[in-house]
């Protein structure tokens, strides 16, 4: 059986404040601009995935193309500046403590996108856990 979750070359930032580097998924807080404004204030000029993602709250803004261009530019800049440490052929074990004290465990690796489908009722090995909003896919493709 071909398992579509594997080891891969994983990039992690070096010498970075990880509390500012990581942000929640871009499809969260879609109706709470204050949340994203607060995150931007916390991050400030520090390196952050906030500058590498397009929170869905901004998908309808007039400057979405400018945001996408900035994201792509930020990605290129970080690669050119040798900002990351590469862990070749790896998986990374993660632990996260929730506000209630419960520890969540995870494993970071790579997935074969040929084994993924967002279509309802799909039987592919990797499926969406919630309904996908098709209109939100094109901006994501421009970023990747």
Model features per residue range: what roles?
Residues 1-143:
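A cross-family signal for N-terminal binding/gating loops and helix N-caps
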């Amino acid at each position: 059986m071909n398992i579509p979750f594997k080891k891969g070359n994983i990039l992690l930032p070096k010498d970075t404040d990880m509390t500012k580097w990581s942000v929640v998924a871009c499809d969260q807080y879609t109706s709470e601009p204050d949340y994203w404004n607060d995150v931007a204030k916390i991050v400030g000029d520090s390196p952050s995935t906030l500058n590498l993602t397009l929170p869905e709250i901004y998908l309808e803004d007039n400057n979405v193309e400018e945001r996408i261009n900035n994201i792509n530019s930020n990605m290129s800049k970080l690669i050119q500046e040798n900002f990351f440490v590469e862990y070749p052929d790896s998986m990374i074990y993660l632990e996260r403590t929730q506000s209630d004290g419960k520890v969540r465990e995870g494993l970071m690796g790579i997935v074969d996108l040929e084994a993924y489908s967002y279509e309802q009722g799909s039987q592919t090995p990797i499926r969406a856990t919630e309904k996908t909003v098709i209109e939100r896919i094109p901006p994501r493709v421009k970023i990747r």
